[in-house]
UniProtKB/Swiss-Prot annotation:
Homodimer. This is tRNA-cytidine(32) 2-sulfurtransferase. GO terms for biological process: tRNA thio-modification. InterPro entries: Rossmann-like_a/b/a_fold, TilS/TtcA_N, tRNA_Cyd_32_2_STrfase. Catalyzes the ATP-dependent 2-thiolation of cytidine in position 32 of tRNA, to form 2-thiocytidine (s(2)C32). The sulfur atoms are provided by the cysteine/cysteine desulfurase (IscS) system.
Length: 308
């Protein structure tokens, strides 16, 4: 399989972003056994490919075990993943659990199956990780998934909550990691096409229309078309939180402001920002000063004392 220079740049970017996420969040450590969850979709194929590449040159030793959960969906091509995983030389396990029948029995026709399906999958994955001695569980969620989840929780749950790149399971037995947290869905899709991964569609829930996640995803993609880079900016915001400028009394001691126990810089008190204001001009207008808008720019880092 021959590839262009554009492909190698794409591959390098994905590997670099994944390596940075692993380092930033301490996702993988020396001696870890990582259970790589394979659904047969573009995200999990890409995750495995990138992790295998990083494993070869990482300064630490860790083990990868690929896992696929055969949920007994009618028409599921059982041979595809075993053949692929064997061809790339990774240790793997196929776990059979008829979660499909349970979902179809419990969920009324026309209702979303995602929630129950996800809970059942988690249970099987955690049990498999324990049986195999895997202390890390890798999922294929990417940057766009994280931003999508943030808006879902905000719109429908009233919480500023996203999808963490790393978290512990409820019983503390395993750490769940998302190595593709810094990678865009667009890059992953391009990589999967170039690599010609044998993609397996999700027939159980993929055809259900008008789901909240689908609507939010469409909204974000429209924003991205109108203003390229917006999804990346939103993700950057999730990594640059200022608790004193929100309204959660659990995150910031607002009551302490009256007694000097908590402080906020004085510029913020008067609404000053670190944004650069630029003139807003209209098509055919010669007047560049009729209105101004705010454009985000990070404030320059303060120079050390004594710097000329």
């Amino acid at each position: 399989m021959s590839h262009s220079n554009n492909f190698y740049r794409l591959e390098t970017r994905l590997q670099s972003q994944t390596g940075k996420a692993i380092g930033d969040f301490g996702m993988i450590e020396d001696g870890d056994t990582v259970l790589v969850c394979m659904s047969g979709g573009k995200d999990s194929y890409t995750m495995l490919s990138v992790l295998m590449a990083l494993q070869k040159r990482a300064p630490i030793k860790f083990k990868l075990i690929a896992m696929n959960l055969d949920q007994k969906q009618p028409g599921f091509p059982e041979h595809i993943l075993p053949e692929y995983l064997k061809s790339v030389g990774v240790e793997y396990v196929i776990v059979e659990a008829d979660t499909y029948s349970i979902v179809k029995e419990k969920v009324p026709e026309g209702k979303t199956t995602c929630s129950l399906c996800s809970r059942l999958r988690r249970g099987v994955i955690y049990r498999t990780a324990k049986e195999l001695g895997a202390n890390k569980i890798a999922l294929g969620h990417h940057r766009d998934d994280i931003v999508n989840t943030f808006f879902l929780n905000m719109f429908f749950g009233g919480k500023m909550k996203a999808m963490p790149p790393k978290l512990a399971t409820d019983d503390g037995a395993h750490i769940v990691i998302r190595p593709l947290a810094y990678c865009s869905e667009k890059d992953i899709a391009s990589y999967a096409r170039a690599m010609e991964f044998p993609i397996i569609p999700c027939n159980l829930c993929g055809s259900q229309e008008n789901l909240q996640r689908k609507k939010v995803s469409e909204m974000l993609q429209e924003w991205e078309r109108q203003n390229p880079g917006r999804i990346d900016n939103i993700f950057s915001a999730l990594r640059n939180v200022v608790p004193s400028h929100l309204a959660d009394t659990e995150l910031f001691p607002f009551t302490g402001l009256a007694t000097g126990l908590a402080k906020v810089d004085e510029a913020s008190l008067f609404g000053e920002t670190t944004f650069q204001q630029q003139p807003l001009t209209f098509a055919g207008s010669l007047d560049e000063n009729r209105m101004e808008f705010v454009r985000f720019e990070r404030a320059p880092a303060a120079e050390p004392a004594g710097t000329p």
